[in-house]
Curated annotation (Swiss-Prot):
<dbReference type="GO" id="GO:0046933">
    <property type="term" value="F:proton-transporting ATP synthase activity, rotational mechanism"/>
</dbReference>
<dbReference type="GO" id="GO:0005524">
    <property type="term" value="F:ATP binding"/>
</dbReference>
<dbReference type="InterPro" id="IPR038495">
    <property type="entry name" value="ATPase_E_C"/>
</dbReference>
<dbReference type="GO" id="GO:0005886">
    <property type="term" value="C:plasma membrane"/>
</dbReference>
<keyword id="KW-0375">Hydrogen ion transport</keyword>
<keyword id="KW-0066">ATP synthesis</keyword>
<dbReference type="GO" id="GO:0042777">
    <property type="term" value="P:proton motive force-driven plasma membrane ATP synthesis"/>
</dbReference>
<keyword id="KW-1003">Cell membrane</keyword>
<dbReference type="InterPro" id="IPR002842">
    <property type="entry name" value="ATPase_V1_Esu"/>
</dbReference>
<dbReference type="GO" id="GO:0033178">
    <property type="term" value="C:proton-transporting two-sector ATPase complex, catalytic domain"/>
</dbReference>
<comment type="similarity">
    <text>Belongs to the V-ATPase E subunit family.</text>
</comment>
<comment type="function">
    <text>Component of the A-type ATP synthase that produces ATP from ADP in the presence of a proton gradient across the membrane.</text>
</comment>
<protein>
    <recommendedName>
        <fullName>A-type ATP synthase subunit E</fullName>
    </recommendedName>
</protein>
<comment type="subunit">
    <text>Has multiple subunits with at least A(3), B(3), C, D, E, F, H, I and proteolipid K(x).</text>
</comment>
<keyword id="KW-0472">Membrane</keyword>
<keyword id="KW-0813">Transport</keyword>
<keyword id="KW-0406">Ion transport</keyword>
């Protein structure tokens, strides 16, 4: 026969086993809920962090692009400064060139070829006498007007045609300089 105590122990063990099984199930469900909640929070914050990182990367790329453009602008500005410096030095050398025999021969050639009776010649103050001598020698009837802005060379105006031709050294220098600007940049900057 089974004693009361054995029966009680058996009954208690049965209940204990049921409670333990229920507790294991509850613990397993709680762990699953915690794992799912953790995974959801992890996904949510991972997405937020990824979004934040992407936004910051886009902002940084934008800043880098702005800086590169600004850098190119500054470099271009500096290159222009040095190229203009070369041009100004070339312009200063014109003052020496107008004193040479080659210049005077070139001036006479232009006058012989381009100036006709009734023309108006604009020239520098230093060239006025030379031009006057050339037109007397060539027997051309024209007017000479001094232009303080001209370093060398001449401008010719044909009133009958309302036409003007510019043979000033400044204009020639500007045209030549514009044509070879890229070559000058290559020499100065290796580009």
């Amino acid at each position: 026969m089974v004693s009361f105590e054995d029966l009680l122990n058996y009954s208690l063990n049965e209940e204990k086993n049921k409670i333990t099984e229920e507790f294991k199930k509850i613990l397993s469900e709680m762990n699953q809920i915690i794992d799912e909640a953790y995974a959801e929070v992890y996904r949510e914050y991972s997405a937020k962090i990824t979004d934040l990182v992407n936004k910051n990367n886009d902002r940084i790329r934008g800043e880098i692009a702005k800086m590169e453009i600004e850098n190119k602008r500054l470099i271009s500005k500096e290159m222009d400064y040095w190229i203009e410096n070369v041009k100004e030095n070339a312009k200063k050398s014109l003052y020496e060139f107008v004193k040479t025999d080659n210049y005077k021969k070139g001036l006479e050639s232009i006058i012989s070829r381009e100036v006709s009776d009734g023309s108006i010649i604009y020239c520098s103050p230093s060239d006025q006498k030379s031009i006057s001598d050339i037109i007397k020698k060539k027997k051309i009837s024209c007017k000479i007007v001094v232009d303080e802005k001209i370093v060398g060379g001449i401008k010719i105006y044909y009133p009958d045609k309302s036409l003007s031709k510019d043979f000033t050294l400044e204009t020639i220098l500007n045209q030549v300089f514009d044509d070879i600007r890229d070559k000058i940049a290559q020499i100065l900057f290796g580009e």
